Amino acid sequence: VSAKPAKXXVTAGEQAIAMT
């Protein structure tokens, strides 16, 4: 992921939401 969230880590669920 080129643009990662400020949390630092991204879970599979959050990644799926971001890709929606």
Swiss-Prot record:
Keywords: Membrane, Mitochondrion, Mitochondrion inner membrane. It comes from the Eukaryota. It is found in: Mitochondrion inner membrane. Pathway: Energy metabolism; oxidative phosphorylation. Its main location: mitochondrion. The keyword Membrane applies. Component of the cytochrome c oxidase (complex IV, CIV), a multisubunit enzyme composed of 14 subunits. The complex is composed of a catalytic core of 3 subunits MT-CO1, MT-CO2 and MT-CO3, encoded in the mitochondrial DNA, and 11 supernumerary subunits COX4I, COX5A, COX5B, COX6A, COX6B, COX6C, COX7A, COX7B, COX7C, COX8 and NDUFA4, which are encoded in the nuclear genome. Component of the cytochrome c oxidase, the last enzyme in the mitochondrial electron transport chain which drives oxidative phosphorylation. The respiratory chain contains 3 multisubunit complexes succinate dehydrogenase (complex II, CII), ubiquinol-cytochrome c oxidoreductase (cytochrome b-c1 complex, complex III, CIII) and cytochrome c oxidase (complex IV, CIV), that cooperate to transfer electrons derived from NADH and succinate to molecular oxygen, creating an electrochemical gradient over the inner membrane that drives transmembrane transport and the ATP synthase. This is Cytochrome c oxidase subunit 8B, mitochondrial. It comes from Thunnus obesus (Bigeye tuna).
